[in-house]
Regions:
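Short beta-strand-to-turn element immediately C-terminal to the catalytic PLP-Schiff-base lysine
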Residues: 95-96, 111
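Glycine-rich nucleophile elbow surrounding the catalytic serine of serine-hydrolase chemistry
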Residues: 88, 92-94
Length: 120
């Protein structure tokens, strides 16, 4: 089984891949873990990890800067119902809109809004 960690220019991809590989080994799973920005790799994958580090806007821009990536993710998640795991800002992108820097459209897989926390 192929598990793709989507490389769209944000996140600590090496740490994520190593963590998944360790869990794979420790639990006798049979995943091949690949970090890739190639749309065809997403298409061929069995499971997808969408990491994210930084702002909502920067993350969605990273996805949109790779031709065909958002469309392929939508196809795999919404139509094929392929399992996807979001990490940090990667999961926030599942929402309709994010307001961290400015109003920014997300992937709209989960209806909702991501708002900036005012902690102080």
């Amino acid at each position: 089984m192929l598990l793709i960690v989507v490389d769209y220019g944000v996140g600590n991809l090496r740490s994520i891949a190593k963590s998944i590989e360790k869990a794979n080994f420790d639990n006798s799973l049979n995943y091949t873990v690949k970090v890739s920005s190639n749309v065809n790799d997403v298409k061929k994958s069995d499971k997808i990890v969408l990491p994210g580090q930084g702002s909502f806007k920067a993350c969605i821009s990273g996805i949109n800067n790779i031709e065909g990536l958002q469309e392929e993710l939508n196809e795999n998640v919404l139509i094929k119902k392929k399992p996807i795991y979001g990490i940090c800002a990667g999961m926030q992108l599942f929402a309709t809109i994010g307001y961290e820097e400015e109003k920014t459209l997300g992937l709209n897989w989960i209806p909702g809004e991501v708002i900036r926390l005012n902690l102080g």
